[in-house]
């Protein structure tokens, strides 16, 4: 991505640029255009870092689309939709391929800082931060499950597990590329530890729509990938 404001105005970024501005306008109508764009430039720079192969702008776009789809069918609107969208922007904004990194905590801190600059209502910003932190475990407590935004982002972030076979396989290859420095056997064991818990749960997803429409494909994809890793 071209750095600075030139990249912000490049053709491929038009849709994301417009989406960021719209998401900000829904919760911070009095934010200055300069501040909105400064934060947006920083976010897009992060999402285009060269070490990202899966956790990149394509992932951001896919999760935003999944958030919108789930909000539409589940009747999640207003501030709940806004929280889900903003959390999506920040949920992998900090991404380091390092076992000692605390990406979600650092992303949540970034969200709190940047939303405070707009500014966004503190209670709404706190909800965004909570959703970002949820993505560390890809699971929700009973209390978190009562928040529609947290449920939507939980499922949207896991949409790729249910993707068509070609996209799911591409996702698996992209994650492997991010961890190319890890030996094959060690990676296979660690990756299996990440994926297997989704299969042993009663449900991969939390929303009614995702359970009905995404879950069967997700379980097929997960089982196939775990078998491949075992080979």
Show where each model-derived region lies.
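An active-site-proximal "capping" alpha-helix that borders the catalytic cofactor pocket
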Residues: 63, 102-118
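Activation segment
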Residues: 97-98, 162
């Amino acid at each position: 991505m071209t750095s600075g404001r030139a990249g912000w105005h490049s053709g491929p970024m038009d849709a994301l640029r417009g989406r960021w501005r719209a998401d900000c306008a829904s919760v911070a109508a009095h934010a200055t255009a300069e501040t909105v764009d400064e934060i947006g430039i920083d976010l897009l720079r992060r999402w285009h870092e060269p070490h990202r192969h899966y956790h990149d702008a394509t992932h951001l776009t896919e999760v935003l689309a999944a958030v919108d789809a789930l909000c539409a069918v589940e009747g999640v609107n207003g501030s709940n939709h806004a929280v889900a969208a903003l959390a999506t922007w920040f949920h992998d904004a900090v991404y380091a391929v390092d076992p000692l990194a605390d990406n979600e905590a650092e992303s949540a801190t970034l969200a709190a800082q940047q939303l405070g600059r707009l500014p966004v209502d503190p209670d709404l910003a706190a909800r965004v931060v909570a959703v970002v932190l949820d993505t560390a475990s890809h699971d929700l407590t009973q209390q978190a499950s009562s928040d529609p935004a947290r449920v939507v982002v939980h499922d949207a972030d896991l949409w790729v597990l249910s993707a068509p076979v070609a996209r799911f396989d591409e996702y698996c290859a992209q994650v492997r590329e991010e961890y190319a420095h890890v030996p094959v056997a060690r990676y296979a064991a660690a990756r299996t530890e990440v994926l297997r818990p989704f299969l042993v749960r009663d449900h991969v997803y939390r929303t009614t729509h995702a359970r009905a429409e995404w879950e069967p494909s997700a379980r097929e994809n997960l089982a196939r990938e775990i078998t491949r890793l075992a080979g």
